[in-house]
């Protein structure tokens, strides 16, 4: 009976140790994707949005005209794709 208790205790202790090691390595790996994403999506001066003379899709069209291929929705005042009944 003692051998069975000892083997169960060692098995349980091994599983706990395995869990701790996996958790520690996973927490270190979590920093890598954050660093990678922050370097990929870093916004510099080169990537600023240009100001257009026309409004694009789902942009307000109160003051600006919609770009070609879009129409101003009379209900929402957004630039939307033209539907067959709007032509």
Curated annotation (Swiss-Prot):
Where this protein primarily resides, as one coarse class?
A: secreted
Q: Which InterPro entries match?
A: Huwentoxin-1 (IPR011696), Huwentoxin_CS1 (IPR013140)
**Signal sequence residues:** 1-24
Q: Which cysteines are joined by disulfide bonds?
A: 54-67, 61-72, 66-79
What would be one Gene Ontology cellular-component term for the protein? Answer: extracellular region
Q: Where in the cell is it found?
A: Secreted
Keyword set for this entry? Answer: Disulfide bond, Ion channel impairing toxin, Knottin, Secreted, Signal, Toxin
Q: Does the keyword Disulfide bond apply?
A: yes
- Propeptide residues per the UniProt entry: 25-52
The tissues in which it is expressed are: Expressed by the venom gland.
Query: Which Gene Ontology molecular function entries are recorded, alphabetically?
Result: ion channel inhibitor activity; toxin activity
What is this protein for, i.e. what is its function? Ion channel inhibitor.
In the record, the note on similarity to other proteins reads:
Belongs to the neurotoxin 10 (Hwtx-1) family. 51 (Hntx-8) subfamily. Hntx-8 sub-subfamily.
Give the comment on domains. The presence of a 'disulfide through disulfide knot' structurally defines this protein as a knottin.
Protein's UniProt name: U3-theraphotoxin-Hhn1a 4
Which source organism does the UniProt entry give? Cyriopagopus hainanus (Chinese bird spider)
């Amino acid at each position: 009976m003692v051998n069975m208790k000892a083997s169960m205790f060692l098995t349980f202790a091994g599983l706990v140790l395995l869990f701790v090691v996996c958790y520690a390595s996973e927490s270190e790996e979590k920093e890598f994707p954050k660093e990678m994403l922050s370097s990929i999506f870093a916004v510099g001066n080169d990537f600023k949005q240009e100001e257009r003379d026309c409004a694009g899709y789902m942009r307000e069209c109160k003051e600006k005209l919609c770009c070609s291929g879009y129409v101003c929705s009379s209900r929402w005042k957004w630039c939307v794709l033209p539907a067959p009944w709007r032509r």
